[in-house]
């Protein structure tokens, strides 16, 4: 494995941590829940050099690996980096890959649930009870803020990069516009269409002109974070009423104001 600077180090193949039936904060359960991850670097004997790096919106753990290095965000020659796929990204348990709760049968989940699943991965599957740092970019930053709130003593440092505890009004407007584009597709059929509308580039409305501006050029299938977004509506994160008054809130964390420190570790 080589990073963006051309440096080479060992990086694990994609691994999965099995959580069994994972209970969510709303009381629902993700059956046979699995969390995917890659690792880079060497774990110290006392496990004191762990850095957890959750994915951004539409991101995968594999896409994070090239961002590490001696001139990157974190140096695997010093730290054992765990790049973790967030719930719903199409690699960890998601509406698109669940055999027991596919599409609209998949339960509603939150940023807090993502963090709780990562906590269980670390403590139950990997035997890690304290980490040096948690860090994340964009929605990974949102997860970082939630880590600070949910497990403040679990890490020594928290680094949120271009992330915020809550979505802005602009973000919410963007998702609502894309949600409308999905719902207006003639094949929508309440989220159980045989072929989902395209989420990147042009959405498949009757006129095929609704343009999605987030994630253009992605080389992998769309991710499905939260409920009430275009991803949720296409792949079915829970059962969603189509009326606007019943639309779900966008993902957000418990955190209100926490300082971020995007310095290199």
What spans do the regions from the language model cover?
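Alpha/beta-hydrolase-fold serine-hydrolase catalytic core, especially in secreted/extracellular enzymes
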Residues: 4, 22, 33, 59-69, ...
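A domain-start/cap signature at the N-terminus of enzymes
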Residues: 4-25, 35-37
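Short, polar loop/linker segments at the starts of domains and inter-domain junctions
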Residues: 26-33, 207-213
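Surface-exposed acidic, glycine-flexible loop patches that form ligand/cofactor-binding
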Residues: 42-45, 125
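Short beta-strand element of the alpha/beta-hydrolase
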Residues: 47-57
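Gly/Pro-rich cap/lid or specificity-loop segments adjacent to the active site
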Residues: 58-142, 149, 153-165, 170-174
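Alpha/beta-hydrolase
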Residues: 173, 178-265
């Amino acid at each position: 494995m080589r990073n963006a600077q051309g440096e080479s180090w060992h990086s694990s193949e994609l691994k999965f941590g099995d959580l069994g039936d994972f209970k969510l904060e709303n009381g629902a359960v993700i059956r046979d829940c699995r969390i995917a991850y890659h690792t880079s670097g060497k774990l110290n004997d006392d496990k004191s050099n762990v850095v957890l790096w959750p994915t951004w919106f539409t991101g995968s753990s594999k896409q994070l690996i090239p961002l590490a290095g001696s001139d990157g965000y974190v140096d695997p020659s010093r730290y054992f980096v765990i790049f973790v796929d967030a719930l719903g990204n199409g690699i960890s348990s998601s509406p698109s890959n669940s055999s027991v709760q596919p599409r609209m049968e998949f339960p509603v989940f939150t940023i807090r649930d993502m963090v709780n699943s990562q906590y269980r991965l670390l403590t139950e599957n990997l035997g890690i009870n304290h980490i040096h740092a948690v860090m994340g970019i964009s929605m990974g930053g949102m997860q970082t803020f939630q880590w600070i709130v949910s497990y403040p003593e679990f890490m020594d440092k928290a680094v949120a990069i271009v992330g915020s505890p809550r979505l802005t009004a602009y973000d919410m407007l963007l998702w609502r516009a894309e949600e409308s584009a999905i719902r207006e597709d003639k094949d929508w059929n309440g989220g159980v269409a045989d072929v989902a509308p395209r989420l990147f580039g042009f959405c498949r409305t009757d006129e095929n002109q609704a343009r999605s501006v987030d994630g253009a050029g992605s080389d992998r299938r769309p991710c499905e974070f939260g409920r009430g977004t275009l991803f949720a509506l296409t792949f079915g994160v829970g059962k969603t009423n189509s009326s606007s008054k019943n639309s779900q809130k966008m993902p957000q964390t418990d955190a209100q104001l926490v300082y971020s420190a995007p310095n290199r570790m």
